[in-house]
């Protein structure tokens, strides 16, 4: 027999279950449900028929040897009859119910139009006992409704009608509280009530809340109250548990803070109470003292009878330590007679030593480089730059202008390009004002001034490099106006600035390949073809210098290198002598 592996779904309120009697159950199906193979073993299907496992399962269902240890009942020594009185009365603090006056003393059933017509028809032929009033009719109908709701609560489902005998206890109680004989009119009213209930589907005549009775019919009924809903089980996760724990911790912390605040407020009020009692006692004693002074005729100041404003305490000044005079001061000295300051190393001395070592290292490398190139002729221009004392400086210089009161002399017209221009005349210098305003630092204004540099290029061509020149404005045409179509004028984002060394080899090579702007050729006359051809012919005639000129240039270069080496050697010797003198002076001081 194969085991049943059907997963049973969870029951809910909408699941339809058949109700079967004992004789309607199939014996084979019942045996399949109660067989041992249907027990959840927790192992694989192929191993469920294992001998030892089946033996354990059979013994688990038939063995009665195992007993659950349960503590035996013990008689209590507490006598509740002596501790608690027998007549128990509920305290008035319990909440019982809250109803209106009409709900307590009047009838809850209200007559309808059909009830009014029936009552008029019934009173048209009154019995010997008299007519039936409207209040008595409502009381009788209320007894019928309450009894039917209590005895047959599911009358609307199984169509059960409460018999007249069930109404007699309620009618008897009503007959005792009403002055008229209600039982004489109860039977005709019961028949009328029964017909009305059957017309309404055996539902209560009195308006009440409509509850859910059938899943399919009442699912879309808007008047149904308190629908049954399947409670979906929430999945617990670790994050949810942590959140609940944090919430509980926060709640406990807040409650503890509130408790501490209450305790502190209580202590504050108790201190205020003590202060008020002390103030009152002081006031009473002062009043008594004043009466005693008046009685004894003592005249004097009444400062003790008035609360004086406390004076501010002066801050305690720290004690001043007197230093001894200069005659008694002695500078601490060592055992060998030197002062302690002699062992201190100054930062300037350390920096000077590092700079000296660095310069000596550079000079040593320069000398080694010259030794390596001693038997070689280097035709490059300035192969090894000499060491400068003031650091490397850019060979740019500012263009200085001056006013000439007279026509220029022959010396000014014959001035060399590399000569330093004379200082400006006093006419250019402005008088210093008392109040001055500068838009920026002097470095910025200095950088904005134009500067020029002269250099000789290939084939002995003279080049003039300019810096700080004003760029002419660009003219926007139709072909360039669309370039700024999608640009934003927002000042929030500043354009990136890329720091580039203008004298870098790659930067110079890139600038050499940039085509010239068209505005540079604007307004210039056209060059005739004859001049272009003559310039090309002249350039073609230029050749490299002759071997004699190259040899003369190499000789001059070697002579310059030897002079520079002698100069560096003299400087190194002078520095070495200075260092030796310093060491000798230090040794004499020791």
From Swiss-Prot:
Listed GO biological process terms: DNA repair; regulation of transcription by RNA polymerase II
Region of interest: Disordered: 302-335, 471-497
Entry protein name: Enhancer of polycomb-like protein 1
GO CC term, one of those recorded: nucleus
Assembly and interaction partners: Component of the NuA4 histone acetyltransferase complex.
Described purpose of this protein according to its UniProt entry: Component of the NuA4 histone acetyltransferase complex which is involved in transcriptional activation of selected genes principally by acetylation of nucleosomal histone H4 and H2A. The NuA4 complex is also involved in DNA repair. Involved in gene silencing by neighboring heterochromatin, blockage of the silencing spreading along the chromosome, and required for cell cycle progression through G2/M.
Start-end of Basic and acidic residues biased regions: 475-488
InterPro entries per UniProt: Enhancer_polycomb, Enhancer_polycomb-like_N
Pfam families: EPL1
Entry keywords, A to Z: Cell cycle, DNA damage, DNA repair, Nucleus, Transcription, Transcription regulation
UniProt source species: Gibberella zeae (strain ATCC MYA-4620 / CBS 123657 / FGSC 9075 / NRRL 31084 / PH-1) (Wheat head blight fungus)
Entry similarity comment: Belongs to the enhancer of polycomb family.
Chief place where the protein resides: nucleus
Regions crossing the membrane: none
Subcellular location as annotated: Nucleus
């Amino acid at each position: 027999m194969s085991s049943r592996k059907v997963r049973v779904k969870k029951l809910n309120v909408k699941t339809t279950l058949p109700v079967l009697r004992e004789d309607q159950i199939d014996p084979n199906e019942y045996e399949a449900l109660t067989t041992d193979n249907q027990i959840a073993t927790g192992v694989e299907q192929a191993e469920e028929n294992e001998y030892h496992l089946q033996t354990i399962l059979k013994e688990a269902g038939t063995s009665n040897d195992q007993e659950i240890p349960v503590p035996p009942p013990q008689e209590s020594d507490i006598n509740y009859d002596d501790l608690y009185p027998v007549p128990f009365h509920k305290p008035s603090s319990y909440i019982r119910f809250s109803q209106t006056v009409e709900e307590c003393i009047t009838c809850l059933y209200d007559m309808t139009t059909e009830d009014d017509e029936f009552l008029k028809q019934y009173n048209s032929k009154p019995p010997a006992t008299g007519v039936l009033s409207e209040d008595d009719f409502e009381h009788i109908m209320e007894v019928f409704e309450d009894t039917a709701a209590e005895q047959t609560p599911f009358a609307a489902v199984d169509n059960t009608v409460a018999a007249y005998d069930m109404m007699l206890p309620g009618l008897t109680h009503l007959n005792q509280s009403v002055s008229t004989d209600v039982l004489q009119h109860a039977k005709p009213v019961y028949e009328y009530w029964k017909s009305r209930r059957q017309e309404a589907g055996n539902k209560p005549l009195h308006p009440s809340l409509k509850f859910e009775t059938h899943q399919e019919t009442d699912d879309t009924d808007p008047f149904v109250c308190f629908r049954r809903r399947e409670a979906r089980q929430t999945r617990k996760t670790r994050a949810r548990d942590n959140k609940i724990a944090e919430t509980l911790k926060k709640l406990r912390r807040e409650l503890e803070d509130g408790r501490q605040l209450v305790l502190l407020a209580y202590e504050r009020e108790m201190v205020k109470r003590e202060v008020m009692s002390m103030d009152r006692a002081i006031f009473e004693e002062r009043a008594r003292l004043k009466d005693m002074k008046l009685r004894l005729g003592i005249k004097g100041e009444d400062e003790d009878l008035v609360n004086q404003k406390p004076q501010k305490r002066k801050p305690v000044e720290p004690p001043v330590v007197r230093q001894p005079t200069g005659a008694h001061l002695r500078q601490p000295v060592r055992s060998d007679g030197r002062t302690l300051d002699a062992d201190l190393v100054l930062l300037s001395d350390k920096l000077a030593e590092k700079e000296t070592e660095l310069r000596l290292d550079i000079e040593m490398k320069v000398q080694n480089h010259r030794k390596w190139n001693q038997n070689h002729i280097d035709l490059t221009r300035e192969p090894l730059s000499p060491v400068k004392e003031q650091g490397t400086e850019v060979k740019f210089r500012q263009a200085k202008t001056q006013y000439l009161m007279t026509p220029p002399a022959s010396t000014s017209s014959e001035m060399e390009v590399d000569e330093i221009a004379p200082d400006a005349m006093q006419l250019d210098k402005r008088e210093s004002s008392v109040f001055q305003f500068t838009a920026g630092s002097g470095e910025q204004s200095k950088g904005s001034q134009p500067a020029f540099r002269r250099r000789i290029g290939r084939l002995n061509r003279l080049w003039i490099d300019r810096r700080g020149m004003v760029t002419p404005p660009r003219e926007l045409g139709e072909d360039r106006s669309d370039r700024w179509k999608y640009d934003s004028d927002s000042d929030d984002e500043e354009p990136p600035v890329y720091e580039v060394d203008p004298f870098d080899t790659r930067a110079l090579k890139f600038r050499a390949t940039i085509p010239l702007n068209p505005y540079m050729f604007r307004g210039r006359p056209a060059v005739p073809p004859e001049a272009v051809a003559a310039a090309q012919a002249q350039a073609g005639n230029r050749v490299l210098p002759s071997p004699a000129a190259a040899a003369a240039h190499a000789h001059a270069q070697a002579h310059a290198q030897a002079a520079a080496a002698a100069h560096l050697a003299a400087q190194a010797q002078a520095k070495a002598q200075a260092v030796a003198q310093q060491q000798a002076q230090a040794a004499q001081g020791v």
